């Protein structure tokens, strides 16, 4: 055997394998392109430490970071969506529901919990945007109404974090009816003289922005959140005009009176707790930072 054959002999070849990185360990900030460690980003409430861009949060992660640690009770979790119209577009509605339920672990796009905020009893709900773009169907409407009714029964404030693409087209008129249903429920909350704080996050559009998201006693936006009814492209095609840059961002809406304030995610607990305390004439438990 020649020296070359010996060199190429399989026994003399050392196999090297590239180290594989598990999927989901790293992510990239969509604003500054900074590569971020996923666990550290989650601990920082999905806020980029470099540019302070607010990334999307899951509903449960948001409520977990917002409510006090301790006992929390999930409300209306027994409601499950049904395909009453046997709707089909590129996929059957049942298939879309099954895929969203599997990927998110949620039954539908709204999570409601009862707990405390800085020692104050509160009902809080959050949209899960990853579930069919957070679209509002009959289950979302029913859960929101239950949240309102519980707040009235418990004589406490209600907070809602919106992240939604609009009414769920697969449920047709039943989805559109939720706009009136949720608005009527909020009228009962107002008559009970209980506060409703609406937090609009990126992105909040369609039937939710035209109903429950904009009906807060105080409407709060997260920084650079996109908020509107129709999308920019649809509006420009309709009015045949070029629209100003950032006209659907929270900063533009604050400047033009559509929002009351913009609050950083890390300040949300203290700011909302203080607002509810003032509106209900109660005191809060101050946190030591």
Swiss-Prot record:
The keyword Electron transport does not apply. This is Acetyl-coenzyme A carboxylase carboxyl transferase subunit beta 2. Keywords: ATP-binding, Cytoplasm, Fatty acid biosynthesis, Fatty acid metabolism, Lipid biosynthesis, Lipid metabolism, Metal-binding, Nucleotide-binding, Transferase, Zinc, Zinc-finger. A zinc finger (C4-type) spans 29-51. Component of the acetyl coenzyme A carboxylase (ACC) complex. Biotin carboxylase (BC) catalyzes the carboxylation of biotin on its carrier protein (BCCP) and then the CO(2) group is transferred by the transcarboxylase to acetyl-CoA to form malonyl-CoA. Pfam families: Carboxyl_trans, Zn_ribbon_ACC. It comes from Vibrio parahaemolyticus serotype O3:K6 (strain RIMD 2210633). Acetyl-CoA carboxylase is a heterohexamer composed of biotin carboxyl carrier protein (AccB), biotin carboxylase (AccC) and two subunits each of ACCase subunit alpha (AccA) and ACCase subunit beta (AccD). Residues 25-289 form the CoA carboxyltransferase N-terminal domain. Its cofactor is Zn(2+). Zn(2+) binds at residues 29, 32, 48, 51. Pathway: Lipid metabolism; malonyl-CoA biosynthesis; malonyl-CoA from acetyl-CoA: step 1/1. NCBIfam families: accD (TIGR00515). It is found in: Cytoplasm.
């Amino acid at each position: 055997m020649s020296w070359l054959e010996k060199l190429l002999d399989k026994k003399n070849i050392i196999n090297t394998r590239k180290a594989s990185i598990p999927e989901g360990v790293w992510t990239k900030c969509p604003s500054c392109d900074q590569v971020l460690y996923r666990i550290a980003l989650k601990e920082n409430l999905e806020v980029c430490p470099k540019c302070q861009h607010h990334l999307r949060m899951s509903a449960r992660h948001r409520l977990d970071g917002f409510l006090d640690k301790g006992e929390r009770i999930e409300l209306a979790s027994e409601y499950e969506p049904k395909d009453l119209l046997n709707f089909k577009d590129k996929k059957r509605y049942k298939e879309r529901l099954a895929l969203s339920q599997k990927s998110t672990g949620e039954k539908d796009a709204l999570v409601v919990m009862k707990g405390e905020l800085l020692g104050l009893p509160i009902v809080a709900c959050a949209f899960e945007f990853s579930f069919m773009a957070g679209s509002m169907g009959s289950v979302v409407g029913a859960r929101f109404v239950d949240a309102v009714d519980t707040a009235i029964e418990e004589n406490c404030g209600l907070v809602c974090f919106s992240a939604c693409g609009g009414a769920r087209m697969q449920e047709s008129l039943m989805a559109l009816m939720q706009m009136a249903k949720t608005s009527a429920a909020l009228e009962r909350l107002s008559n009970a003289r209980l506060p409703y704080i609406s937090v609009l996050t990126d992105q909040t559009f369609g039937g939710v922005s035209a109903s429950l998201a904009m009906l807060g006693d105080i409407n709060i936006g997260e920084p650079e959140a996109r908020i509107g009814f129709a999308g920019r492209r649809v509006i420009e095609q309709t009015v045949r005009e070029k629209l100003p840059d950032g006209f659907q961002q929270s900063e533009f809406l604050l400047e033009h009176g559509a929002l009351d304030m913009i609050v950083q995610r890390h300040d949300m607990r203290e700011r909302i707790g203080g607002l509810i305390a003032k509106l209900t004439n109660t005191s809060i438990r101050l946190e030591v930072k």
